[in-house]
């Protein structure tokens, strides 16, 4: 089987393929000189479809797709992801592209903070107006990269349930198809607030949330400060980051076959956005965060760059392949559950997103 990797950068998209996860061939840049914050290898149909959320400094953001593994690309005239007339906003970037739980369903998280849903495979999208008009919106802030919904988690069996997260605002969930949304942040710390206000109802700087489809009630979150687990779909959260060298980071990834196995890539902190001691290490837990082990064989020392929230991902092989892209343009891959690594690309622009699929 062929493994496809998409690497979105600040200056275009690169597409790689490998038959053995050892030797890789890349093409690109696709969408040259456009920021690609989001990408997706959608393998649900008979023909795999690649999606890229690209932003041009001249023409703005556009969703593009390819049905021939990146050889040619198509787009919707005038943009598939647009605010309706009267919304008083324009899409600046597409931060997230996620397949939904139904046929042809695709979700997009954007900047400014909004979520859009397509039911026709990405040809058109509708704004989740219940979220856009949420009374908390006026108090949501912007993270260092802007205000955006960077996490969209469809429920694997309930199409009316959707969990989302933004920076800065926190985790929200709908159970009625988007008509209403409730904050789900109890137990998540907000270090930037005064001590007596550090556990608010909403407003946390959540960096990424993930879950395994076989355990939809269990969520894992990487916060601006803190790594957390929820066993009740975000109703309450428990810290699981005490054994890590730092609880600051961006990505958090769950194993495709073992729902208690997760990976994080700790950074030194908000003011030191490279790994502790500049040693690139992936930390893995095999017991849902109760304990952690670091792995770094093949990864560099003197690594003074970070890994963004969507720049680490996992494939569906067993053992699983783990992939990460760094802000110095290097891309790294592991074919043994993250234990040993090799570099598969170098000297690309600043990497914003890495996604894989097996076709």
Model-derived segments and their meaning:
Residues 1-359:
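Extracellular glycan-interacting surfaces
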């Amino acid at each position: 089987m062929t493994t496809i990797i998409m690497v979105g950068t600040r200056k275009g998209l690169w597409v790689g393929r490998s038959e053995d996860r050892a030797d890789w061939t890349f093409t690109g840049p696709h969408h040259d000189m456009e920021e690609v914050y989001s990408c997706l290898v959608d393998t649900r149909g008979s023909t795999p479809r690649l999606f890229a959320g690209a932003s041009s400094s001249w023409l703005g953001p556009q969703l593009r797709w390819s049905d021939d593994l990146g050889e040619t690309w198509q787009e919707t005239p005038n943009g598939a992801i647009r605010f309706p007339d009267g919304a008083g906003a324009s899409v600046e970037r597409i931060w997230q592209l996620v397949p939904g739980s139904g046929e042809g369903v695709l979700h997009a998280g954007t900047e400014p903070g909004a979520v859009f849903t397509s039911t026709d495979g990405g040809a058109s999208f509708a704004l989740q107006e219940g979220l856009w008009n949420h009374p908390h919106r006026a108090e949501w802030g912007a993270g260092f990269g802007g205000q955006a919904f960077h996490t969209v988690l469809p429920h694997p069996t309930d199409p009316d349930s959707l969990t989302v997260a933004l920076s800065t605002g926190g985790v929200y969930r709908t159970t009625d198809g988007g008509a209403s949304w409730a904050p789900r942040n109890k137990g998540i710390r907000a270090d930037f607030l005064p001590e007596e206000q550090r556990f608010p109802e909403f407003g946390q700087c959540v960096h990424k949330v993930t879950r395994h489809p076989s355990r939809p009630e269990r969520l894992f979150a990487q916060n601006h400060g803190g790594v957390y687990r929820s066993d009740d779909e975000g109703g309450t959260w428990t810290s699981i980051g005490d054994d890590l060298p730092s609880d600051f980071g961006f990505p958090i990834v769950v194993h495709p076959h073992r729902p208690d196995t997760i990976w994080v890539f700790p950074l030194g902190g908000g003011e030191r956005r490279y790994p502790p001691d500049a040693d690139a290490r992936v930390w893995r837990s095999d017991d849902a965060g109760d304990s952690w082990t670091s792995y770094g064989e093949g990864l560099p020392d003197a690594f003074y760059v970070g890994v963004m929230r969507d720049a680490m991902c996992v494939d569906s092989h067993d053992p699983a392949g783990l992939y990460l892209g760094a802000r110095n343009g290097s891309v790294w891959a592991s074919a043994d559950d993250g234990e040993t690594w090799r570099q598969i690309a170098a000297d690309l622009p600043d990497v914003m997103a890495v996604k894989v699929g097996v076709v």
